[in-house]
């Protein structure tokens, strides 16, 4: 009798936490963020290369 009450209480707590949890994990959102980081890195790398070329031209090389 006591064991069934404890088991019921644990089950009730778990179901309450499951119902009240935050938004579920979305793998596509993580994939989109990774793509944005790659895009930003490519844009940044191109800008760094352009600045390096401009500095070389300014030095007369």
Curated annotation (Swiss-Prot):
Pfam family, one: Cecropin
Keyword check for Secreted: yes
Organism: Manduca sexta
Compartment list: Secreted
One GO cellular component term: extracellular region
Reported function: Cecropins have lytic and antibacterial activity against several Gram-positive and Gram-negative bacteria.
Isomerase as UniProt keyword: no
Glycine amide carried by residues: 60
Record keywords, A-Z: Amidation, Antibiotic, Antimicrobial, Immunity, Innate immunity, Secreted, Signal
Signal peptide: 1-22
InterPro entries: Cecropin
Main location: secreted
Protein name: Bactericidin B-5P
Propeptide residues, chain positions: 23-24
């Amino acid at each position: 009798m006591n064991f069934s009450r404890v088991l019921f209480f644990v089950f009730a707590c778990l179901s309450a936490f499951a119902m009240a949890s935050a938004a579920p994990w979305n793998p596509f959102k993580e994939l989109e963020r990774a793509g944005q980081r790659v895009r930003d890195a490519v844009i940044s790398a191109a800008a760094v290369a352009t600045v390096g070329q401009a500095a070389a031209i300014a030095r007369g090389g």
